[in-house]
C-alpha cells in the first residue's frame, strides 16, 4: 500500500512538473521579427501585421505584398474593417489553445483582422457572382489591410445598400454570431421571452435587434450608462447589472444568450424555464489554457441530466447568413451600433480599447 502511494506521489509530482514546464514554454513569446525585404517589382499595400504575441504594441503598420489575382477569387479594396475579441485572442496568443492553430512561440500568419467592407477591384476569370465596382462586405483573415482576396463562394456578400462601409464592416462576425445563436442554437420564435446578457456589446446589440425581428420579447442586461441605448434598439425591459442581479429575480426566460460569462450555469438554471435554453457565446472563460473550451465542456456535461439545454458554440461565418443579415438591415430591422472609429494606423489603440471590455457596440477601423 505504501509503495502504491509512493508511486502515485511520484506520478503527481511529475505531472505538476510537466505542467509547469509546458506553461513556462507556452508563456514565453518569441522576439518580434523584422519585416523581410520585398522584391522591387512587388505590388504593395499597407496592412496591420504582428510577428510576435503580446499587447497591442505588437501590431505594426507595414507595407506587405498585395494579394495576387486568382481565377476563382475576388480582389477587394477595403474601405473599413472592425475588430473583435477573436483578434485580441490571436494577438496575445491566449488562451494557449489558440497557439495550437496560430503557432506556439510566434504566430504562423502575420495578418490581423477578419471583418471588412469595400469595393471589388477585380475578379478572376471564373468568377460570375461579383464584378468590379460591387460594394461588398464579409470576413477574411487579414482584413486590416488595404486589400483582401476572397474566394467567390467564401464569406463575402453584397453590402446592404442603406449602410455605409463603416457600418457594414461592423456586421460580419458579431451579427452572424448573434443570428446563429438565436436562430440555430436557441430556436427562437415569436412570443418567447429572451434575455441578452451583455446587451450593449458587439454581439449583444445585434442579438437584441435580431431577437426582436423574430418576434421575441427581449430583456437586455447592461450597465447604467447603456440602459437608454439597449432600450432604443428594441429591448422591452432593461436590467442594470450594477444595481440588480437578474439571476435572483422572479422572471423566467425561454432563452438566454450569454455574451459575457458573468454568472455560472447554476445561476442561469434558476431563471430559465424548465425547458429553456442557455446559449453561451464567445470567450466566456478567461483561463489562459482552454479559454471557452471549458464552457463548452461544462455545457456538454450538464445537458443530458436536466430538461434545460446548455449550449456553447462558435459561429460559422458564411455567405448565406451574410445575405440574411443584409435583408434584415435593408428592411430597417437591424442597424449596426458603432462606438468608436479609428484610422488604420491607430489599430493598436482600437485593439486596446476593445480589450478593456466596455465598448458600446462595435469598434471600427477605416482603411481607405
How would you name each of these model-derived features?
Residues 2-8, 40, 316-368:
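C-terminal hydrophobic helical "lid"/dimerization subdomain
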Residues 9-21:
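Hydrophobic membrane-insertion alpha-helices, especially the h-region
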Residues 66-82, 96-142:
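Glycine-rich beta-strand-centered segment in the early N-terminal region that forms part
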Residues 102-115, 122, 135-198:
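NAD(P)H dinucleotide-binding glycine-rich loop of Rossmann-like/cofactor-binding domains
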Residues 169-240:
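Mid-domain Rossmann-like dinucleotide-binding core that forms the NAD(H)/NADP(H) cofactor-binding site
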Residues 247-255:
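A short acidic, Gly/Pro-enriched loop at the edge of an enzyme's catalytic core
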Residues 263-334, 367-368:
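Glycine-rich phosphate-binding loop and adjacent beta-alpha segment
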Amino acid at each position: 500500500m505504501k509503495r502504491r502511494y509512493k508511486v502515485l506521489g511520484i506520478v503527481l509530482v511529475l505531472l505538476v512538473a510537466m505542467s509547469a514546464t509546458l506553461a513556462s514554454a507556452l508563456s514565453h513569446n518569441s522576439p518580434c521579427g523584422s519585416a523581410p525585404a520585398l522584391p522591387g517589382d512587388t505590388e504593395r499595400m499597407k496592412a496591420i501585421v504582428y510577428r510576435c504575441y503580446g499587447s497591442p504594441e505588437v501590431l505594426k503598420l507595414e507595407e506587405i505584398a498585395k494579394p495576387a489575382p486568382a481565377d476563382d477569387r475576388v480582389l477587394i479594396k477595403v474601405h473599413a474593417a472592425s475588430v473583435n475579441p477573436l483578434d485580441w485572442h490571436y494577438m496575445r496568443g491566449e488562451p494557449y489553445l489558440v497557439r495550437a492553430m496560430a503557432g506556439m512561440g510566434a504566430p504562423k500568419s502575420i495578418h490581423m483582422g477578419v471583418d471588412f467592407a469595400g469595393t471589388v477591384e477585380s475578379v478572376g476569370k471564373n468568377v460570375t457572382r461579383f464584378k468590379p465596382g460591387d460594394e461588398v462586405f464579409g470576413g477574411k483573415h487579414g482584413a486590416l489591410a488595404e486589400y483582401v482576396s476572397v474566394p467567390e463562394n467564401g464569406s463575402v456578400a453584397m453590402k446592404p445598400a442603406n449602410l455605409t462601409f463603416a457600418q457594414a464592416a461592423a456586421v460580419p462576425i458579431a451579427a452572424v454570431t448573434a443570428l446563429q445563436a438565436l436562430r440555430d442554437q436557441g430556436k427562437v420564435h415569436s412570443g418567447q421571452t429572451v434575455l441578452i446578457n451583455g446587451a450593449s456589446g458587439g454581439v449583444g446589440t445585434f442579438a437584441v435587434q435580431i431577437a426582436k425581428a423574430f418576434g421575441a420579447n427581449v430583456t437586455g442586461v447592461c450597465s447604467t450608462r447603456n440602459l437608454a441605448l439597449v432600450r432604443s434598439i428594441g429591448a422591452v425591459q432593461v436590467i442594470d447589472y450594477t444595481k440588480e442581479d437578474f439571476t435572483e429575480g422572479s422572471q423566467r426566460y425561454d432563452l438566454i444568450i450569454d455574451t459575457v460569462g458573468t454568472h455560472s450555469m447554476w445561476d442561469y438554471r434558476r431563471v430559465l424555464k424548465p425547458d429553456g435554453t442557455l446559449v453561451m457565446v464567445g470567450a466566456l472563460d478567461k483561463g489562459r489554457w482552454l479559454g471557452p473550451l471549458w464552457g463548452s465542456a461544462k455545457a456538454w456535461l450538464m445537458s443530458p441530466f436536466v430538461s434545460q439545454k446548455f449550449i456553447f458554440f462558435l459561429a460559422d461565418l458564411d455567405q448565406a447568413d451574410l445575405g440574411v443579415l443584409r435583408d434584415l438591415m435593408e428592411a430597417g430591422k437591424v442597424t449596426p451600433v458603432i462606438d468608436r472609429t479609428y484610422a488604420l494606423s491607430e489599430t493598436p489603440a482600437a485593439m486596446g480599447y476593445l480589450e478593456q471590455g466596455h465598448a458600446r457596440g462595435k469598434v471600427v477601423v477605416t482603411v481607405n
